Amino acid sequence: IIIKESSREMMPSHIGLSNFSIFFILPFYSKKASSPTKMGEIMNLGVPIICNSGVGDVDEVMKKSMPELLVKEFNNKEYESVIDIMLNDFKPNRKIIRQTSNNYYSLNNGVRKYLDIYNQILN
């Protein structure tokens, strides 16, 4: 495992070199309706993510692209299970990861969805 400080400008390059990205967000009530921006950015680079469930749409997005890497509980059994998958079985499908990112986080899709909502309200 290599942990390295990086400037904002170098983040895409460094993330793109990664085999995995990992982040955990405590699933507080305020996080139920949020979505981690970094998740879309990382997935758009085709990098598999290890993260926890219970935050915004994370569960749904992970189940579509890399369900094996979703940590459902903060305990050693879950961590060990994901580590075992990482080290032995997991072959990331970077194309699926990128497609899922595009489906959920694309600016064009977001603009279109908001436009549809506003049109429904106004009509």
Task: List PLM regions with ranges.
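Conserved short-loop catalytic and cofactor-binding motifs
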Residues: I2, P27-K31, P67, R98-N102
